[in-house]
Amino acid sequence: MAIEKKFITDGVRNVRVEKFLTKELKRAGYGGMDIARTPLGTQVTIFAEKPGIVIGKGGKQVRQLTQDLATDYDIESPQVEVQQVQNPNFNAQIMAERLANALERGWYFRKAGSSTIRRIMESGALGCEVIVAGKLTGSRSRTQKFTEGYIKHCGEPSETIVEKGYALAIKKLGTIGVQVKIVPPDARLPDAFDVLEPEPKKAPAEPIEPEEVGDDVFEEEFEETSEEEYVEEV
C-alpha cells in the first residue's frame, strides 16, 4: 500500500472510531481518544469523565469495546486503556456534549453559550470560543459565536494549543451543531516570552592601603629576628 493511501485509510478509520466511541460512551462523559502503534499491537487510550462506566462491571464494557474495535474497525490487537479527565472544564469534547445536552433540554442558546464560556474562563483557561449553528429560533438556520480571551484560528498554534470538540443537539426544529475551542492555561502561546531578572552584582572589594611603618619598627623586628637565630645556632 502506498504511503499516501495508508495515511488516508488511517484517517478515515480514526474518524469512524471517534464517531463510534462518542455514541457508545456518551453517558461516561467521553472526552476523546488517542491511537498509537506499539510493538505489541495498537494502543487505544480513551479519555472519559467517568471511567467506571467505560470499564463496566467486571470489565465487561471495555472487553466489548476491544472486540468491536478489532472486528468492525480492523484495528490490529487493540489494547484499550481508560484515563480519567482531570478537569472536564478544559476538555473541549466534554464541554461540547454538555452544551448540546443543555440545548436539547430546552435552554435558550444564548444562555447556554454564555454559561459555557463563563465556566471555562473561570476555571483558568486562556481563551474559549463557542459556535452554535442551526435552527436556533426560527425556520432559518443561523450561526451564533461566543468568544472570550485568546484564540488562535490558523497556523501551527491552532493545531497544537487549541483543544477542539464537536457535538450535535437534536431538537424538534432540526439539528444544531455545537463547536467548542479551548486554550488551556498551560498552553505556550507563540508570542509569549520570559523576562529574566538580572543577577545582583557583587560590590567591588575595597583596595587595601599599605600601612606606613617607620624605621623604628623595622629595626626592632630585625633585632628580634637576629636574637632568635642566634639562640637556635647556639
Swiss-Prot record:
Q: Which Gene3D superfamilies match?
A: 3.30.300.20, Ribosomal protein S3, C-terminal domain
One GO location term (cellular component):
cytosolic small ribosomal subunit
The UniProt record lists the keyword rRNA-binding:
yes
The reply to whether Plastid figures as a keyword in the UniProt entry is no
Q: Name one Pfam family in it.
A: KH_2
Signal sequence residues: none
| Record domain KH type-2: where | 17-86
What's an example Gene Ontology biological process for this entry? Answer: translation
Which function does this protein serve?
A: Binds the lower part of the 30S subunit head.
* Description of how the protein assembles with itself and partners: Part of the 30S ribosomal subunit.
Q: Protein name, please?
A: Small ribosomal subunit protein uS3
Question: Which organism's genome codes for this protein?
Answer: Methanoculleus marisnigri (strain ATCC 35101 / DSM 1498 / JR1)
- Write the gene name: rps3
